[in-house]
Design a protein with these regions (language model features):
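OB-fold/S1-family single-stranded nucleic acid-binding modules
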Residues: 555-574
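Acidic, metal-coordinating catalytic cores used for nucleic-acid/nucleotide bond scission
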Residues: 86-89, 121-123, 146-153, 196, ...
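Hydrophobic residues positioned within well-ordered beta-strands of beta-sheet architectures
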Residues: 513-515, 545-547, 560
Length: 574
């Protein structure tokens, strides 16, 4: 028997007061039950919060960072920006790169700017071989700026400093405590800034630095236009990096989406909007559209394409966007074929799934997540590094054990490094030790107490709220559509105890189905849902069910996107 329950289900005076004052009950329940504080909830429910644009001078060391860049521009230095291969890293590089380019151009400086976004196969963060090439080719004063990385690359930073190169670190990750003392750092965690700044993505940090820099270059025209443009890119990065919805991030995402609707942003993102004929964008369009498309470039070792796309102009934006779409399609196809290949290789009797696959560096985590979820096993997908001496892997937990601690306990003759958390880790091992590694991992898993490795069975389904057919209406669709802060996870509802009176499968895809339903109040509703037909038929086509899913618009009218179907005889509603 499955137990259906609401998330937290908090009842307090503040919640009731909001409902009594006429605020949408479903929205109020979502905000309170998800644990947002009263200040954040009031901000979100306020009709005027969209006009409150983010400030950019409140981040520790951001003005010093702007002074450093200004000085190097004035001196005609060589400036490098070193980014990251994901959407946040590429957007961070775009924002700061565009601002510095404008400052150099309009101040008639002889400074030169170069952008470096590594391919995934080069690894995350400052790369020592790249640092060595910068030192070897140094002919003038040089500044290296990291965006969305750098706070954990202590050896690389020290090497640059020791060789006379200035370094400015901008990051939003947790420091490792070993960065040299004589380097300027803009990182809210390193500097113990406020919670709003700790919630920034890399692009948010880059934005604050970029705007402080442009304040020093009033020769740059239309700085307000650049401000609006950059907020769009901060919104994209905030959504795709699944950042916490602090008050500042709410402002970035809400205003960024609104500004994109109004035509702001780079040529690349406004082209994306127009190409998809979507002037009513929501964060979901970014999270499942443009975000994965940009990320696909990094996953397929073509990060330069993502950067070129963001910097594109009217003449080449169409061709570059088409390349990005093709790259994402290739990523999807490669993921599908790699999962199929992996399933042919795995030993179903083994306590774990540990496989080495070729050419899957950027999608190893997706493959590992898929197999771990499907087979309820700790899963690690490896691929060889460029030297062939090491295997770099993505590890995913099946929910039964603390995978990080297990991997840390394995003999260091095999493991080179491991990091992450209990559910998802990155690990590097010596290629020659793969068999020993698998043997030791399986021995550890097999030796754990039975209660720690009992088969995972989902016994509880947690939703944001219970709804009825009458709740699937225009008002709720509009209210939910406007909740741009739900980028971390979309609201999930239980449409409880409905009777299916009619079904119809799509002629083109039997997995897409139309449902006609009714409830105990004799409300009737008809809607289509994608990718659910196989599950429905596997359940024996039950008639009395609870649908788990999302309220949304489909075909221009209120609808329900089914994520799961549970026959009523299999569920207990709390």
């Amino acid at each position: 028997m499955l137990e259906l329950t609401k998330m937290n289900n908090i009842n307090n005076n503040f919640k009731q007061e909001l409902i009594d004052n006429g605020y949408n009950e479903i929205i109020v329940n979502l905000l309170v039950n998800r644990g947002y504080d009263e200040e954040t909830i009031c901000t979100l429910l306020s009709t005027g919060y969209s006009e409150e644009l983010p400030i950019y001078n409140d981040l520790t060391n951001v003005q010093i960072g702007a002074d450093i860049i200004e000085s190097h521009i004035a001196n005609g230095s060589r400036i490098y920006i070193y980014g990251d291969y994901d959407s946040d890293g590429v957007n961070s590089t775009y924002i700061l790169g565009d601002a510095i380019n404008n400052a150099i151009y309009y101040s008639n400086s002889s400074a030169q700017l170069s952008l470096k976004v590594p391919e995934r196969c080069e690894g995350y963060g400052l790369n020592m071989s790249w640092c060595q090439s910068i030192v070897a080719n140094k002919t003038t004063d040089t500044l290296v700026i990291t965006v969305d990385n750098g706070i954990a690359q202590d050896q690389e930073v020290a090497y640059l400093l020791d060789n006379g190169i200035d370094v400015l670190i901008t990051d939003h990750h947790t420091p490792n405590g070993h960065i040299p003392a004589n380097v300027w750092i803009i990182d809210a965690f390193h500097n113990n800034d406020n919670e709003n700044n700790k919630g920034l993505c890399g692009a948010g940090v880059a934005f604050k630095l970029a705007m402080n820099l442009l304040d020093r270059f009033q020769c740059v025209p239309n700085i307000d236009e650049l401000y609006y443009k950059y907020i769009v890119h901060v919104a994209i990065a905030t959504i795709t990096d699944s950042m916490p919805m602090t008050i500042d991030n709410i402002k970035y995402v809400y205003n960024g989406i609104q500004l994109l609707k109004d035509g702001y942003g780079s040529e690349a993102v406004t082209y994306y909007r127009d190409y998809n004929s979507n002037t009513d964008l929501t964060p979901k369009d970014i999270a499942f559209g443009l975000g994965p498309q940009i990320n696909a470039c990094g996953r397929m070792n073509n990060t330069a394409l993502a950067l070129n796309y963001l910097f594109s102009d009217n003449e080449d934006v169409e061709d570059l966007y088409n390349e990005v779409v093709v790259t994402n399609d290739e990523r999807k196809a490669k993921t599908k074929s790699s999962i199929e290949q992996a399933e042919k290789m795995l030993d179903i009797e083994s306590p774990s799934i540990v496989l080495e696959l070729d050419g899957i560096e950027g999608i190893a985590g997706i493959i590992a997540s898929n197999l771990s979820s499907k087979y309820n096993k700790c899963t690690i997908i490896f691929s060889k590094d460029m030297s062939g001496k090491y295997l770099i892997g993505s590890a995913r937990n099946d929910g039964r054990v603390d995978l990080l601690n297990i991997l840390r306990s394995i003999n260091n003759n095999s493991v080179v490094k491991v990091g992450g958390h209990s559910a998802a880790c990155g690990i590097t091992i010596k290629a020659s030790r793969i068999k020993s590694f698998i043997k030791e991992l399986n021995e550890i898993l097999s030796s754990l107490p039975k209660e720690e490795v009992e088969e995972v069975v989902d016994t509880k389904i947690v939703v944001d709220d219970y709804i009825s057919i009458s709740d699937i209406n225009k008002d709720n669709c509009e209210s939910l559509k406007d909740l741009y802060f739900f980028t971390e996870s979309n609201p999930v509802f239980a449409l409880t105890d409905v009777t299916i009176t009619k079904t119809k499968a799509s002629n083109n895809n039997k997995n897409n189905m139309m449902f006609s339903i009714t409830d105990n109040d004799n409300n009737k509703f008809e809607f289509w849902s994608w990718g659910i037909g196989e599950q429905y038929r596997a359940l024996g086509e039950p008639k009395n069910v609870t649908f788990i899913g999302e309220i949304e618009y489909k075909f221009g009218k209120p609808s329900f996107n089914i994520l799961n179907i549970v026959p009523m005889e299999m569920i207990s509603i709390c």
